[in-house]
Amino acid sequence: MEPLVQQTERFSELLAVSCGSLVSTWDAEKVRRALQWARYLLHVYRRFAGRGRVREALERRLPARGGPLGLRSFAALESGDARLALRLLRNRALAPAAARALPSLLFPGPAADHRDDVPQSRLVLLARRGSALRLLCRLGGDAPRSALLRTHAELLDARLHELGGADSAAARKLLDTLWTRGPREHVLDVTAEALLLREEDPEPAQATDPAGADETQKLLRWLLESPEVLAAFCRHLPAKRLASVAGCHHALSRAYLDLLTTWATRLHYDLQKGAWVPTQMEDMPWEELCLRLQSLCHAQPFLQEEVLVTLRSRKALDGDFEVPGMSIWTDLLVVLECGIVLE
């Protein structure tokens, strides 16, 4: 175990160095050995990805070596060769001889042995993500919002994958940091997009990817275990958008419906206005409450059933009144069952 840990630590240091000026002393042979080392660790990742003890031992040691430019997790070994290659390609300090040899080392052609070990697809994916992010950043406010959200969601998903492991502590720390430091509305929008990534993916293999399901579960767990974030998520997202997300994740739909019923109890009936009104500024207005419940009903048949069962149960507990204004549950059911459009 210890030799493997040392190998990984040393490669993490090399990965950090590949961004700096020290590569000016590298020749073609050194670049070749560095790439071989990265591919060896790719085999290590594939062999031990499902072994919890090995992952935990490596996860504990990696952040301390190589700094932020090195390996951040055991899962990062899966793309270590591509990251190394991309950094060398971008580093103008790389010695000329090594720079000339690098393309042939990365793309040896169809006659090369072990073609599945060549980082072509992983390199292309990283390069595309990096280029897309840089382009969107340069466009600034002119960037299409859907493209920006999609790119940020894919980057978040990739980062959660890199954190790896069954322990979600590292994922939660990352998400908490984003929530604390980032623009909160944007974090909520990116979270929603990330939860829809595989549901909207046209490729069946992507939509059923078990590894991707791990990232989704980490994101869902963070959302459901953070009351402040969950409440903000369920208030900020447009009704139709949130209903689409809830329709893909039953635990979220249940939590969302619980919040809506809680917010409903805070409204009171104003006899003079003949309407349900908030008691405090932060309460959800009647019109928005109805719109969100309608959107849930229209999203999926099972959601409509859950909403109606919940409201009927609440109505029965509240006295089963049929007179308008006596019970908010009665009036909500009238809106939903009669199909009154509030959009």
Curated annotation (Swiss-Prot):
Tell me a GO cellular component.
Fanconi anaemia nuclear complex
Name listed for the protein in its UniProt record? Fanconi anemia group F protein
Name the GO terms of the biological process aspect. DNA damage response; interstrand cross-link repair; ovarian follicle development; protein ubiquitination; spermatogenesis
Annotated compartments? Nucleus
- What is the purpose of this protein? DNA repair protein that may operate in a postreplication repair or a cell cycle checkpoint function. May be implicated in interstrand DNA cross-link repair and in the maintenance of normal chromosome stability.
**Which top-level group of life is the source organism from?**
Eukaryota
Null phenotype? Viable with no gross developmental abnormalities or significant growth retardation. Gonad defects are present in both male and female mice. Testes are devoid of germ cells. Ovaries show premature depletion of primordial follicles with almost complete loss by 14 weeks of age, and aberrant estrous cycle. Significantly increased incidence of tumors, particularly ovarian tumors.
Q: Which UniProt keywords apply?
A: DNA damage, DNA repair, Nucleus
Q: How does it assemble?
A: Belongs to the multisubunit FA complex composed of FANCA, FANCB, FANCC, FANCE, FANCF, FANCG, FANCL/PHF9 and FANCM. In complex with FANCA, FANCG and FANCL, but not with FANCC, nor FANCE, interacts with HES1; this interaction may be essential for the stability and nuclear localization of FA core complex proteins.
